[in-house]
Amino acid sequence: MDHLPIFCQLRDRDCLIVGGGDVAERKARLLLEAGARLTINALTFIPQFTVWANEGMLTLVEGPFDETLLDSCWLAIAATDDDTVNQRVSDAAESRRIFCNVVDAPKAASFIMPSIIDRSPLMVAVSSGGTSPVLARLLREKLESLLPQHLGQVARYAGQLRARVKKQFATMGERRRFWEKFFVNDRLAQSLANADEKAVNATTERLFSEPLDHRGEVVLVGAGPGDAGLLTLKGLQQIQQADIVVYDRLVSDDIMNLVRRDADRVFVGKRAGYHCVPQEEINQILLREAQKGKRVVRLKGGDPFIFGRGGEELETLCHAGIPFSVVPGITAASGCSAYSGIPLTHRDYAQSVRLVTGHLKTGGELDWENLAAEKQTLVFYMGLNQAATIQEKLIAFGMQADMPVALVENGTSVKQRVVHGVLTQLGELAQQVESPALIIVGRVVGLRDKLNWFSNY
């Protein structure tokens, strides 16, 4: 270990930054957030320093480096564009046994600045020891996506409850189980973020009163249309916290690779026409695992409330009194159309969009007359096997035979393929693609050649 990670208490303590440019400004911002009494010594200053000085937030000392400014300091930073000056600052600080950071010169510094994730009072610091700041930044960005913004509020509130937890729960094991429930309770976190004191108190009392081995919960998470980058931050956080993930065939391998490593995984293989596990059995899996006290994530492709049968699954849980929540996802219509260069609405061509299932219950029938109307875009989910019927019905109810159509296979993924033509060719085009695929019908499809961007990468 080349460096010892420590967190410094700088509030109301004198610190010095030598340099008045953009880099110095970034360092100053961090020290000000930490509550330091800050002096800036430089030949010239960018405007932000003048603003801060006028507000009484720091002191400016114009002129060459004055090492006597270090005499009362706890910490110094050399942030000029002159290596000689930076080395002088480092040497002067070293002689006074003051920790000094030298920007872009870790060997000349007695401490280095990490990349910081601030969820005060929770702080996470990432460092490459000065060898690769870009790598540290990339890791910080990844960690940022895993840590909810409201985590700091939850941590502060936890501090207020520590004495009560210690009094109510006699053993370390009981306290650990309580805190595990506490920190993954989405309702509590949201109530704290909304400053809803009544809801916070109600949720807290419920956490204290329910048995530690209480029933678990189910989180219905939309995985998006395929590209792992389209998974929402909240969705990512949920699959990282899951004890068990129940997932469909439409959830990509890239997304499953983001699931917590020690979480159990149950594949139920649902896709239009390929039901590996009956819906009722899926409902029972969710119920059974939640009743064991597990945190269950039901991971579905797209959005769980748009042709995902999410409502049916939650009705079962609701009837059994199992707590649940829903994390929306980017639905396939939105993702696939965007990655195909097909806007779903456009002032000149479509004032509305209809999301339509091509997989009806036995005896069901669509409202073909309204679907055939002008100035709208139709997106058919699970319609591949019904493409010929869709073509026939739309033409029969008055849609123009030359209406542009597109079929998007494996949308938003590296395997995406788009075939397009006109309505009279829809049945034939459907023979050229495989599920999962969407059918898009409307004049907006004609914009694809101009707006297509994804196939260029």
Swiss-Prot record:
User: Matching PROSITE patterns, A to Z?
Assistant: SUMT_1, SUMT_2
User: Could you say which residues bind S-adenosyl-L-methionine here?
Assistant: P225, G301, G302, D303, I306, T331, A332, M382, G411
Q: Which keywords does UniProt give here?
A: Cobalamin biosynthesis, Lyase, Methyltransferase, Multifunctional enzyme, NAD, Oxidoreductase, Phosphoprotein, Porphyrin biosynthesis, S-adenosyl-L-methionine, Transferase
User: Is-annotated flag, keyword Flavoprotein?
Assistant: no
Its organism's taxonomic lineage begins at:
Bacteria, Pseudomonadati, Pseudomonadota, Gammaproteobacteria, Enterobacterales
> Where are the bilayer-spanning segments?
none
Give the gene symbol.
Answer: cysG
The highest taxon in the source lineage is Bacteria
Q: Does the keyword Methyltransferase apply?
A: yes
Q: What is this protein called?
A: Siroheme synthase
EC number(s) on file: 2.1.1.107, 1.3.1.76, 4.99.1.4
Give the protein's biological function. Then it catalyzes the NAD-dependent ring dehydrogenation of precorrin-2 to yield sirohydrochlorin. Finally, it catalyzes the ferrochelation of sirohydrochlorin to yield siroheme.
Locate the region Uroporphyrinogen-III C-methyltransferase: 216-457
**What biological processes does GO assign it?**
cobalamin biosynthetic process; methylation; siroheme biosynthetic process
Q: Give the family this protein belongs to, as stated in its UniProt record.
A: In the N-terminal section; belongs to the precorrin-2 dehydrogenase / sirohydrochlorin ferrochelatase family. In the C-terminal section; belongs to the precorrin methyltransferase family.
The residues responsible for catalysis, as annotated, are D248, K270
Residues reported to bind NAD(+): D22, V23, L43, T44
What reaction does this catalyse?
uroporphyrinogen III + 2 S-adenosyl-L-methionine = precorrin-2 + 2 S-adenosyl-L-homocysteine + H(+); precorrin-2 + NAD(+) = sirohydrochlorin + NADH + 2 H(+); siroheme + 2 H(+) = sirohydrochlorin + Fe(2+)
**Pathways per UniProt:** Cofactor biosynthesis; adenosylcobalamin biosynthesis; precorrin-2 from uroporphyrinogen III: step 1/1; Cofactor biosynthesis; adenosylcobalamin biosynthesis; sirohydrochlorin from precorrin-2: step 1/1; Porphyrin-containing compound metabolism; siroheme biosynthesis; precorrin-2 from uroporphyrinogen III: step 1/1; Porphyrin-containing compound metabolism; siroheme biosynthesis; siroheme from sirohydrochlorin: step 1/1
